[in-house]
Amino acid sequence: MSDFDPAEPKSGNPDRRDFLGGLAAALGAAAVAGGAAETAEAKPAKGSSSRPVSDAKLRAAIDTVVVIFAENRSFNNLFADFPGLQQPLSEVPAERTRQRDRDGKVMEKLPKIWEGLVPSKQVVEHTEYLIGPDDLAPIPNGPFALKTPEGDPLPHGLVTRDLVHAFYHNQMQINGGANDQFVAWGDSGALVMGHYGDMRAQLRMWQIAREFTLCDNFFMGAFGGSFLNHQYLIAAQPPFYPDADKSPAAKRIAKLEGDDPKGTRLKLDPKTPASAIDGPAVFGPNTLSPDFWAVNTMLPPYAPTYELDAAKPGYANADSAHTLVPQQHKTIGDMLSAKGVDWAWYAGGWNAALEGRMNDASFPSRPNFQPHHQPFNYYDRFAPGTADRAKFLRDGGEGSTARTNKFLADAEAGKLPAVSYYKPQGNLNMHAGYSDIDAGDRHIAAVIDALRASPQWEKMLIVITFDENGGWWDHVAPPKGDRWGPGTRIPAVIVSPHAKKGTVDHTIYDTGSIARFLTRRFGLEKLEGLKMREDAMLAAGGVAPGDLTGALDIA
């Protein structure tokens, strides 16, 4: 199973001048994320942008940076009442958590969980589970701890149903910062409001966070899903599809309310029920914006991918509506290479996918490789046969031991490059619908153990974070930014001998803060998208996102 849907989310490159012009226009658009909402009092995140640390001391302290990029969890979903939070969920007034229907009225109760909480039969700890839409009692309007029909905490080893997580949906759910229409514009009914209530004792990541630094104001860089947030991680901008209206992808261009191509609201299909109580909203295509930015999932132009060119080995089918044209704009990889800084993207299951083994017949499927989670594979600089592809795009192997996992083997041998991105294979990434919390949590804990035992540990900084919220609700209003984000709050843990110990860092960060840290530590040219985001947030009266140094204790 994959989170790529060749249809649309079922709720229901330009040259430098064009890039700067498009992003500059985005700054002028009204951002929906952090503005005061008419329907509820939004309580935005507050925090300083960074802690003063001299560049010289930073260079002396950190030689190796590792980014572990997991999948699809909001901050509340995993860390709702972690000790020391600025805005713990249990202290949020009920009126700030109530969801509003499509007509803007407060809902009397939440809908059923459409398709069921656990729609596929599974066995966890010798107990069989199959939890359908009618198996849970009516759920009051507000956040709730995920439980079985018997009232026990939902086992972390269960794969729940997936939730829609997409660019326009996320903005409509955030609703100007009120975060009160996650149910209305989601596709899973009540499930968006669920969280795991027993993490203190069960989640290994909690223990890692308690030892090091948890960031409680870290927001996903872009509204929406995995594809766009992986691109934001490395480029701080969406990909662009020139002349998309004349391309095979023409029918995937979004239809919005009004005539503004920079609009934020999808046009509703007439078949949409008036109330979310009666079923999910129905929308038309929305992969590309009307001005041709790729904002929802498209597939890479190169293998590994789902639709290959039979006549051109290593390449995708360019005539497919799902294939994105190769991109040319700058990424953090370009900036690192320009400075002579070694780096790599380790993709779990990469070689398996190239060999045709993306999945197996089990559930959850293994390794369940996700082509759209490999952001550098969209750029012509890394096309098949190039030296850069061979050097920088690496197979991460499979599993959680150095015998089978090549990233762990390099860590154990002290051979990681100065900057390493690690993307776990699909069944170990925590993505609802095809992965479970426990498998991903155990895997990340094993990775952290290996990194702490590495010869490179003493001068290492590790960022554990998630690409996006996966459709799950969070109560903290994202700061007002630019056209692309920031979106919903997500977890981030900073692990390092130089991280503050037992600390919750309240600094405002977004996914781009990782690139900001790399830019500062290695003296890189700054990506244009990072500058745009900083300018937009300052212009909105907020602070620019920090560069992660607020989580460090460097004397």
Please describe what each predicted stretch is:
Residues 2-555:
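N-terminal pro-sequences and low-complexity stem/linker regions of secreted or lumenal proteins
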